[in-house]
């Protein structure tokens, strides 16, 4: 029941808050919220039965056609920090579906939604709302990296514009210095880890914003843009409106934490962010693998027949 209540609230929050309107929308959105909460409950159970990666692949297939992968994937072993933009909805599912590793943990804010998914709890590094308690998050990440595990971090710490929906915008927000602090901590404690930038796009298909659902152009009504995108998210999770669309995942070069010797946390973070920003240029010069990934690097989210 918690999942249903939370899902319904998330759908309603993108619409007018008048009591009568909200009551009517609650009736309208009840079935989509019920379907979504059912899918998420099944995902939570599947994590225990099938593992996080396979559970994510199966859930992703409920919402998207596939993941189109561009570039060489991460190494199969050794501590790995995956740094990705965060357009929302399917980005985590795309990353999990594409990673060939079973040791993944995701850094995520403490939310009621995640608490309602008990199967996911062991795969999360929760970020407390109280900033004074966040030093433990850095220590938990460092512990996983030292042990050779994979950590997925969204360094902007917030939802960012989808780079395929907004090619006229710079989709990488300012990053947390946690990236640089982790590198310095590893150097001080005598271990190293890989750093893999990633860029995810296409989680919000452009066709969902045609006609009356069109979004304001860059520099226009920012609040209006965010509202229309939140409503599109509702159609994706509640009505599977992106079921025939693919998410694109571009991998950057694999960096190593010990190649940044002598730099400050801010300088390290800036260097890695610059590397990730280079992925934005993939679709702006020459052939466009964002739209036409090479045959060698394109694959479905799952090898299972549909």
Language-model-detected regions and their locations in the chain:
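Catalytic core of membrane glycerolipid acyltransferases/transacylases, capturing the structured
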Residues: 80-132
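Short His-Asn-centered micro-motif
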Residues: 71, 83-86, 107-110, 154-156, ...
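A cross-family acyltransferase "interaction/gating" segment
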Residues: 162-261
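Charged, low-complexity C-terminal accessory regions
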Residues: 223-306
């Amino acid at each position: 029941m918690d999942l249903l209540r939370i899902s319904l609230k998330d759908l309603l929050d993108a619409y007018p808050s008048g009591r009568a309107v909200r009551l009517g929308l609650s009736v309208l959105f009840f079935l989509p919220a019920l379907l979504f909460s059912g899918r998420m409950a099944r995902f939570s159970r599947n994590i225990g039965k099938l593992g996080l990666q396979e559970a994510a692949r199966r859930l992703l297939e409920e919402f998207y056609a596939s993941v189109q992968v561009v570039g060489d994937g991460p190494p199969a072993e050794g501590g790995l920090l995956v740094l990705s933009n965060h357009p929302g909805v399917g980005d985590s599912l795309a990353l999990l579906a594409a990673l060939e590793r079973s040791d993944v943990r995701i850094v995520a804010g403490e939310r009621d939604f995640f608490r309602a998914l008990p199967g996911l709890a062991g795969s999360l590094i929760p970020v407390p709302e109280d900033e004074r308690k966040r030093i433990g998050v850095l220590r938990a990440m460092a512990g996983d990296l030292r042990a050779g595990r994979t950590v997925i971090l969204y360094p902007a710490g917030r939802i960012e514009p989808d780079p395929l929906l907004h090619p006229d915008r710079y989709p990488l927000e300012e990053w947390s210095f946690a990236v640089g602090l982790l590198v310095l901590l590893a150097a001080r404690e005598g271990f190293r880890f890989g750093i893999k930038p990633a860029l995810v796009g296409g989680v919000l298909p452009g066709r969902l914003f045609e006609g009356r659902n069109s979004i304001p152009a860059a520099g226009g009504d920012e609040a209006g843009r965010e509202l229309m995108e939140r409503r599109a998210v509702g159609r994706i999770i509640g009505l599977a409106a992106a079921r025939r669309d693919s998410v694109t995942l571009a991998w950057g070069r694999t960096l190593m934490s010990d190649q940044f010797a002598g730099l400050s946390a801010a300088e390290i973070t800036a260097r890695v962010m610059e590397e990730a920003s280079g992925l934005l240029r993939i679709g702006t010069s020459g052939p466009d693998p964002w739209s036409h990934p090479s045959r060698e690097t394109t694959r479905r989210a799952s090898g299972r027949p549909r």
